[in-house]
């Protein structure tokens, strides 16, 4: 199994549809170019955009309104993924004012290959073969453009740097590569991504070197210079190392599949990259100099932790029910059904747990696909994003995202001891010591948490300089940077997909338990975003304790004791229970006074609000049948947990406060609030 998640932020900021489409196409080729070619079996996407309600008057010049941008990137992923015949099955959408000018567009792909196809080796004398689309001027300097700050003039100046995608061409290319791999007709493969042929051939020939005749590269049209041919980022192209004796067979397979394949050079063994163009030498570089010759940069970094503050309750607290409705309607929490329904989840026939679940179509924590059709072993995919606390504590932001991603897949039934992680760092201007300091803290968190959880990072990507500069109406220079952001992706193994667990409530009479200790971690919460509270503790991660919680929960799921499970994240406990009730189409009771909690100074109504909506990580709500209830103490021995309610027939959520106050909210009101935001245009 292999997995990769890429970013395509700058291109999507100026051309949302094309930027997102080629972002997905590129990451599919990354997986296709792993080993001797992996079959893409699932896609994921995560979008971070500005507040969808931002008035047009507040947009800097050259910035696309968030609603229109989001619709564009969704359409790009939809059209490319659906036409490729790959299910887009997992993802998330996050909103923050800091993403107004610099949206973040993450695209990921999971692939599968035979074990004996995992290793590739280029040999001297192998042919350099380019297969797939033709080369044009589209995408030239795309990598350079993606590494600089955006401005009001970026669309006019760099529009040509956005690549042009063609999903059907890539679909045909995938079929050709998989068939050629099955017949062992090439020794190594990589995709033409950033830098085009220059990076693809340069990476494959990093030790051996290569000679390339640029005149042989198939072109879309005449008039390109040698430089343009060499660095074009035209899409749907792969570079293969082919033994001379296999070239004719490979060419026949390409012709049968309708793919153009051309031998453009040879891997030489002399340790140099030599380019020929129109009968002369167009370039010659020593490979060691090319890859190792640049001096290593040393940049200053500085990080000054922000002091913790006591929570300040900034307005009269509304009822728990009214606050819950507001949170369910908040952009980060509200249903993303309008996006999800545009994607094909069923193609290839391996989808098991899908993004919407239960009779009421509530949200999933993670999604699960079979690795091979007809077999019961599965792959669970989950993502974690704690963007709201990035400016407050980058270590906790990164750690929290990792723990959330792992919690999502464990809640679905993945083995916590067999989880692989990916990191995607998106930052502002790291030439500034303060910004680089926060990046260093986030990197430390990735190391620390991965070690404590026993989960390795197998891939990653960074996207820096996510800064937008403009001049306002008064002639004053302005700048907006994104908040420090780490997207964590977790991929876990599920031994038997028939035993997976989903969040939707199943049966009246079953009991509800909360696993994990609740603390007053209100900073960066949805409650704070609503303006109910300001400040408080940032959610804190104790990774060794989380690992023990994950293992205990996994054992209970494996033994069949857990019928439904939902991790507690955005919106806190009541939002999680409400989503479970919406999915199941049945009601629940919850007693906040029974929740295991360690609160600082919250009292009275503030204690209710804290327990209901704090976003302390590594907590779960579980539905347990009465016949399994007696074993919960055995399964969860040594970790905080408690019975807090039950599943009921009445279509409502009944809430009892810490001091006995009772209120209820009808299920249809919860569902309407959750589905109230349709940001589709």
Where are these regions (language model features)?
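Glycine/proline-enriched, intrinsically flexible loops and inter-domain linkers
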Residues: 1-681
């Amino acid at each position: 199994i292999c997995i990769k998640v890429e970013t395509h932020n700058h291109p999507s900021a100026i051309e949302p549809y094309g930027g997102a489409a080629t972002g997905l196409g590129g990451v599919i080729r990354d997986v296709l170019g792993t080993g001797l070619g992996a079959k893409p079996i699932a896609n994921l996407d995560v979008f971070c955009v500005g507040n969808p309600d931002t008035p047009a008057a507040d947009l800097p010049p050259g910035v696309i309104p968030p609603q229109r941008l989001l619709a564009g990137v969704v359409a790009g992923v939809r059209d490319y993924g659906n036409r490729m015949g790959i299910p887009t099955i997992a993802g998330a959408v996050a909103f923050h004012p800091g993403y107004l000018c610099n949206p973040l567009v993450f695209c990921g792909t999971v692939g599968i290959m035979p074990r004996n196809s995992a290793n590739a080796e280029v040999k001297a004398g192998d042919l350099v073969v380019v297969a797939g689309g033709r080369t044009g001027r589209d995408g030239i300097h795309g990598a350079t453009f993606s590494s600089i700050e955006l401005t009001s003039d970026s669309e006019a100046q760099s529009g040509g740097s956005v690549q042009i995608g063609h999903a059907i061409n890539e679909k045909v290319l995938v079929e050709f590569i998989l068939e050629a791999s099955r017949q062992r007709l090439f020794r190594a493969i990589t995709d033409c991504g950033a830098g085009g042929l220059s990076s693809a051939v340069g990476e494959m020939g990093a030790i051996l070197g290569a000679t390339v005749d640029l005149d042989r590269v198939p072109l879309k049209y005449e008039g390109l210079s040698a430089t343009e041919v060499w660095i074009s980022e035209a899409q749907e192209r792969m570079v293969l190392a082919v033994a001379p004796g296999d070239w004719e067979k490979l060419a026949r397979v390409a012709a049968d599949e309708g793919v153009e394949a051309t031998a453009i050079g040879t891997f030489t063994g002399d340790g140099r990259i030599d380019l020929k163009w129109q009968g002369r030498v167009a370039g010659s570089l020593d490979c060691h100099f090319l890859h190792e010759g640049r001096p290593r940069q040393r940049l200053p970094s500085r990080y000054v932790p922000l002091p913790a503050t006591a929570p300040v309750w900034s307005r009269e607290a509304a009822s728990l029910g009214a606050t819950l409705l507001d949170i369910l309607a908040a952009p980060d929490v509200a249903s993303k059904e309008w996006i999800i329904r545009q994607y094909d989840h069923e193609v290839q026939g391996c989808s098991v747990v899908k993004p919407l679940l239960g009779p009421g179509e509530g949200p999933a924590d993670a999604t699960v696909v079979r690795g091979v059709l007809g077999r019961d072993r599965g792959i669970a995919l989950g993502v974690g994003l704690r963007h709201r606390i990035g400016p407050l504590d980058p270590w906790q932001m990164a750690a929290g995202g990792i723990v959330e991603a792992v919690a999502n897949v464990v809640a679905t039934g993945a083995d916590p001891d067999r989880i692989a992680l990916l990191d995607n760092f998106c930052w502002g201007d790291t030439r500034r010591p303060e910004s680089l300091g926060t990046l260093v803290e986030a990197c430390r968190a990735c190391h620390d948490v991965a070690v404590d959880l026993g989960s390795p990072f197998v891939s990653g990507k960074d996207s820096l300089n996510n800064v937008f500069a403009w001049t306002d109406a008064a002639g004053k220079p302005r700048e907006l940077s994104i908040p420090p952001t780490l997207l964590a992706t977790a991929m876990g193994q599920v031994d038997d997909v028939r035993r997976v667990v989903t969040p939707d409530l199943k049966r009246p009479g079953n009991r509800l338990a909360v696993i994990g200790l609740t603390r007053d971690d209100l900073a960066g919460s949805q409650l704070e975003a609503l303006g109910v509270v300001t400040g408080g503790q940032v959610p804190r991660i104790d990774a060794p304790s989380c690992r023990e919680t994950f293992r205990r929960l996994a054992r209970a799921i494996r033994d069949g004791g857990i019928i439904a499970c939902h991790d507690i994240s955005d919106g806190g406990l009541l939002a999680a229970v409400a989503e479970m009730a919406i999915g199941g189409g049945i009601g629940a009771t919850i007693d906040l006074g029974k929740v295991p909690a360690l609160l600082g100074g919250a009292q009275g109504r503030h204690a209710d609000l804290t327990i209901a909506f704090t976003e302390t990580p590594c907590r779960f709500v579980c539905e347990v049948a009465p016949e399994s209830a007696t074993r919960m103490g055995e399964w969860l021995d040594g970790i905080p947990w408690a019975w807090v309610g039950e599943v009921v027939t009445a279509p409502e959520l009944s809430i009892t406060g810490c001091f006995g106050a009772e209120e209820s909210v009808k299920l249809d009101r919860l569902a309407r609030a959750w589905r109230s935001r349709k940001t589709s245009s």
